[in-house]
Amino acid sequence: MQHKVVSIGDIKVANNLPFVLFGGMNVLESRDLAMRICEHYVTVTQKLDIPYVFKASFDKANRSSIHSYRGPGLDEGMKIFQELKETFGVKIITDVHEPSQAQPVSEVVDVIQLPAFLARQTDLVEAMAKTGAVINVKKPQFVSPGQMGNIVEKFKEGGNDQVILCDRGSNFGYDNLVVDMLGFHVMMQASEGAPVIFDVTHSLQCRDPFGAASGGRRGQVAELARAGMAVGLAGLFLEAHPDPDHARCDGPSALPLAKLEPFLAQIKAIDSLVKSFPELDTSK
């Protein structure tokens, strides 16, 4: 299989290259917390020599409850991202929810993300494609891996082939997700070798069927991440928090920030081992 390389500045993302970490926090809770979390990620990834892109949302437009915290909004969010870039020299990824957000966001961040719930919205796809930015597409929980090729094709028709695909689990009955390890390879095939990354923390969400917030299983984040990265992927998508029990969004699935270094050391060891093997075609 041919492996497409997507460049985020000097960072190369491909399924056969050393993995890239897309990591940070779920939503911007405050400027100071974003600075603290980003600094820790930068320190750890530099120590372990892992290519790194900071992740956070400026607006969580798809919260379960109308009363849930959404974030600081577009203007304040872009100010925080700009300060993070100037202070730490990081690349940044964030999600957009409306076509009108695509251009102003692309002027600040390096990768714009198409949320899973919106991945088939053609107007949003077209607006994102027109920016020319690198795109990260979250696979909807209700879409099969093979169907992701159609979304990539929409971006190509819009003039943008700089697309990364991200798996964040698939519906498994009601209120539960499961990760299909075979699906990673299917996504690569369907997209003609596009980089595929794994959102491990969102894949650990589980819902109270009558509740107003997502639960999670952060006690299993290491096991699931090790399994996924053993497939041989372009990157890992991860959220961490210094106090997950009091995070304002998705704390139950967030990695405790203090565990970041030992966690990433394991992931890098697995990624390096898997990619040291020659590719093995067992189809014939």
From Swiss-Prot:
- Keywords in alphabetical order: Cytoplasm, Lipopolysaccharide biosynthesis, Transferase
Major site of localization recorded for this protein: cytoplasm
Highest taxon of source: Bacteria
Q: Which PANTHER family match?
A: PHOSPHO-2-DEHYDRO-3-DEOXYHEPTONATE ALDOLASE
Compartments (UniProt record): Cytoplasm
Family matches, as NCBIfam families: KDO8P_synth, PRK05198.1, PRK12457.1
Please indicate if the UniProt record lists Hydrolase as a keyword.
no
Q: What class of enzyme is it?
A: transferase
Q: Which GO terms describe its cellular component?
A: cytoplasm
**EC number(s) stated in the UniProt entry for this protein:** 2.5.1.55
Source organism: Proteus mirabilis (strain HI4320)
Q: Where are the transmembrane segments?
A: none
Q: What's a Pfam family in this record?
A: DAHP_synth_1
Q: Can you state which reaction this protein catalyses?
A: D-arabinose 5-phosphate + phosphoenolpyruvate + H2O = 3-deoxy-alpha-D-manno-2-octulosonate-8-phosphate + phosphate
**What is one process in the GO biological process aspect for this record?**
keto-3-deoxy-D-manno-octulosonic acid biosynthetic process
| Family assignment from sequence similarity | Belongs to the KdsA family.
InterPro entries according to UniProt:
Aldolase_TIM (IPR013785), DAHP1/KDSA (IPR006218), KDO8P_synthase (IPR006269)
Q: In which pathway does it act?
A: Carbohydrate biosynthesis; 3-deoxy-D-manno-octulosonate biosynthesis; 3-deoxy-D-manno-octulosonate from D-ribulose 5-phosphate: step 2/3; Bacterial outer membrane biogenesis; lipopolysaccharide biosynthesis
Name used for this protein in its record: 2-dehydro-3-deoxyphosphooctonate aldolase
Output one GO MF annotation: 3-deoxy-8-phosphooctulonate synthase activity
